Amino acid sequence: MSDQSEYKISKDDEHSIYASEINKEKLQNTASPDVDYGDTASLKIDPKVEKKLLLKMDLVISPIIGFLYLMAFLDRSNIGNAAVAGMTEALSLYGERLNVAVSIFYVLYILVETPSVVLVKRIKASRMLAFISFAWSMTVLFSGFMSSYGGLIATRLILGLLEGCLFPALNLYLTTHYTRKEQCQRLSYLFASAGLAGAFGGLFAYALEQVHAGNKEGWQWIYIVEGLVSFIGVPLCLFALPDKMENAWFLTREEREVAIIRRDINARYHGEQHFEWSEVRKAFKDPKVYVSATSQFCADMVLYGFSSFLPVIIKGLGFVGLQTNYMTIPVYIAGVISFLFVAWLSDRTQLRAVYLISASTVVAVGYIIMLASDSNAAKYTATYIIAIGCYIGPGLNLGWLNNNVAGHYKRATAIGIQQTLANSSGIVAGQIYRSKNAPKYILGNAFTLGCVIVGGLAYVVMFFSLRYVNKKRDERCARGEFDPSAIGDFADDFRYYL
């Protein structure tokens, strides 16, 4: 599907867009100054060298961004573990106070996503991520010293403000250094980190709950220790995460040359390197951004709700305490493995919609079982069915948007818009999955099932809309009709991923 998923180009454009040669002057102007590239008049990409380059990028970049997102996910979700470990009594979290504290995290979280992601390129990703990591680690650390409900609300707001800048920045970073056909697999590593946090976060918290030292209770040590561990991300970002692959410390001279050629090949995808408000406005006016945001909202509802009712169902099977945590592990692992495989397959086939629609169908079946059955065994089986598709939806849909928005600042804005609207589902989930509705959570599960159906329909709308545009562009190109004023993903030679 190469023609259907990349730019179609004219012969005159071949050198500037998809050439395998790059001139010496460009290399010397953009590459690391400590490398002498010699005669590079006819450089070509060696597949073996590119394979080594990608492997090295994966081995360095993926663990760093995976660690950041894993800790961020732990730090935002540890409120539930802390509440069980004694924070409820210590801070008087009675009535709906805990639900409010959970939901209020997303108020500033969703407000900062769009403006922060636009700033990534101007600030440099390594510096921005290091600052975010430092600030949120400090916030989590000092959460261990809270003494009132007001203090909890304040720390949740600050944490939301900081973590709202994180995920869009990580996602945009991946789109900067990986090609369109490589992105979903790498994005799956981020969601795998979230799954691992869900699988083992409870065990980690359980171990910390047993600590009673320094006049601190177990719930306080959860915050203190997790905050300290999060600090590891600061030096990793500052000293190990490259802003430009042509200057990456872990690449050889030959691999840096290939990195430069890859960047040149994808020049039109990355678009204008200087900030322009017109690119921001294009994102706000693009209908596909809002269709994507709608389906992302629906997919995120599954994620946020899933983590709420899973422990309750397992407790209903007769398991208690540490046993409950053990029983959640295989469910989360099933979700992680499923998404890693589907993301790899999606990049391999360069298809998106077919996997998203299939995942929605699977998740819907799981929720129907959850609502229709009174058997805890059947409900536990349903959690596996839901887990198989719950990461595919938000992960692959975000990757689909990444693929189909060209121009760095337009794409950055589109990511911010999508994530802002989608993460408002966190506020909703905190209100429809209430403890008084346990263990059936009929309201929450029924609402989420409705979201799954709406999200699936949004995927269908997106697929047929993009296929129609691709077909029309094929026809115009066949007639030799090109609109020279159309740029980015609106250009006649741009083909959307389907």
UniProtKB/Swiss-Prot annotation:
Q: Which GO terms describe its molecular function?
A: carboxylic acid transmembrane transporter activity; transmembrane transporter activity
Q: Name one GO biological process term.
A: carboxylic acid transmembrane transport
Q: What is its main location?
A: membrane
Topology of the protein relative to the lipid bilayer: Multi-pass membrane protein
Per UniProt, subcellular location reads as:
Membrane
Which CDD domains does this UniProt record tie to the protein?
MFS_FEN2_like
Give a Gene Ontology cellular component term annotated to this protein.
Answer: endoplasmic reticulum
The record's PROSITE patterns line, in alphabetical order, gives: MFS
**Hey, what's the signal peptide range on this chain?**
none
Which Pfam family, giving just one, matches this sequence?
Answer: MFS_1
Q: Which UniProt keywords apply?
A: Membrane, Transmembrane, Transmembrane helix, Transport
Please name the InterPro entries in this protein's record. Answer: MFS (IPR011701), MFS_dom (IPR020846), MFS_trans_sf (IPR036259)
Which parts of the chain span the membrane according to its record? 54-74, 100-120, 128-148, 150-170, 188-208, 221-241, 302-322, 326-346, 353-373, 381-401, 446-466
Describe the family membership recorded for this protein in Swiss-Prot or TrEMBL: Belongs to the major facilitator superfamily. Allantoate permease family.
Question: Which protein are we looking at?
Answer: Uncharacterized transporter C11D3.18C
Q: Which organism is it from?
A: Schizosaccharomyces pombe (strain 972 / ATCC 24843) (Fission yeast)
